[in-house]
Amino acid sequence: MAPNASCLCVHVRSEEWDLMTFDANPYDSVKKIKEHVRSKTKVPVQDQVLLLGSKILKPRRSLSSYGIDKEKTIHLTLKVVKPSDEELPLFLVESGDEAKRHLLQVRRSSSVAQVKAMIETKTGIIPETQIVTCNGKRLEDGKMMADYGIRKGNLLFLACYCIGG
């Protein structure tokens, strides 16, 4: 932050976490504050709602656009929005020349093991040899699909371990 820039002290309150305090510039976006909150709470930015009084702050707007531009302390309230758990259509893309596609109906609450079992049903490839990625991340056993930020229409990519060399 430039030495002459006015500095804000932002306090974020929540029922679930201790008071969080951040220094900010009036021209910082609300999203930047949400990223600070994520670093302390692990709550994804898209699942956060920040309130100034009863007004919901929009991620792309700057703090100054809400009249927050002087050297002062502001108090924000954090609410966590739980994503719904409806079935989401995802497409599984097999590796190889054919790149076959399969439709999978997956819930955010589905475990990676459950998804790998669905993949076995569609492809015949056993879970032990499956390498599945979504949004650039390898799906790990013991995790839930919600951990990967899945959305309707995401692609899952399937590759396999080569057994025996």
Curated annotation (Swiss-Prot):
Tissue: Constitutively expressed in mature dendritic cells and B-cells. Mostly expressed in the reticuloendothelial system (e.g. thymus, spleen), the gastrointestinal system, kidney, lung and prostate gland.
InterPro entries in the cross-refs: Ubiquitin-like_dom, Ubiquitin-like_domsf, Ubiquitin_D, Ubiquitin_dom
Residues annotated as domain Ubiquitin-like: 6-81, 90-163
Post-translational modification: Can be acetylated.
Chief location category: nucleus
Induction: Rapidly degraded by the proteasome. Cell-cycle regulation with highest expression during the S-phase (at protein level). Induced during dendritic cell maturation. Negatively regulated by p53/TP53. High levels in various gastrointestinal and gynecological cancer cells. Induced in RTECs in common renal diseases including diabetic nephropathy (DN), IgA nephropathy (IgAN), and hypertensive nephrosclerosis (HN), as well as in hepatocellular carcinoma (HCC) and during HIVAN. Inducible by the pro-inflammatory cytokines IFNG/IFN-gamma and TNF in cancers of liver and colon.
Entry GO terms, CC: aggresome; cytoplasm; cytosol; fibrillar center; nucleoplasm; nucleus
GO MF annotations in UniProt: proteasome binding
Cellular compartment(s): Nucleus; Cytoplasm
SMART domains in the cross-refs: UBQ
Assigned keywords, A-Z: Acetylation, Cytoplasm, Nucleus, Repeat, Ubl conjugation pathway
Positions bearing the site annotation: Activation by thioester intermediate formation with UBA6: G164, G165
Result of changing H75D: Decreases interaction with MAD2L1, no effect on the interaction with HDAC6, UBA6, NUB1 and SQSTM1 and moderately attenuates UBD-induced tumor formation in vivo
Family: Belongs to the ubiquitin D family.
Assembly behavior: Interacts directly with the 26S proteasome. Interacts with NUB1; this interaction facilitates the linking of UBD-conjugated target protein to the proteasome complex and accelerates its own degradation and that of its conjugates. Interacts (via ubiquitin-like 1 domain) with the spindle checkpoint protein MAD2L1 during mitosis. Present in aggresomes of proteasome inhibited cells. Interacts with HDAC6 under proteasome impairment conditions. Forms a thioester with UBA6 in cells stimulated with tumor necrosis factor-alpha (TNFa) and interferon-gamma (IFNg). Interacts with SQSTM1 and TP53/p53.
Described purpose of this protein according to its UniProt entry: Ubiquitin-like protein modifier which can be covalently attached to target proteins and subsequently leads to their degradation by the 26S proteasome, in a NUB1-dependent manner. Conjugation to the target protein is activated by UBA6 via adenylation of its C-terminal glycine. Promotes the expression of the proteasome subunit beta type-9 (PSMB9/LMP2). Regulates TNF-alpha-induced and LPS-mediated activation of the central mediator of innate immunity NF-kappa-B by promoting TNF-alpha-mediated proteasomal degradation of ubiquitinated-I-kappa-B-alpha.
Protein name: Ubiquitin D
Phylogenetic classification of the source organism: Eukaryota, Metazoa, Chordata, Craniata, Vertebrata
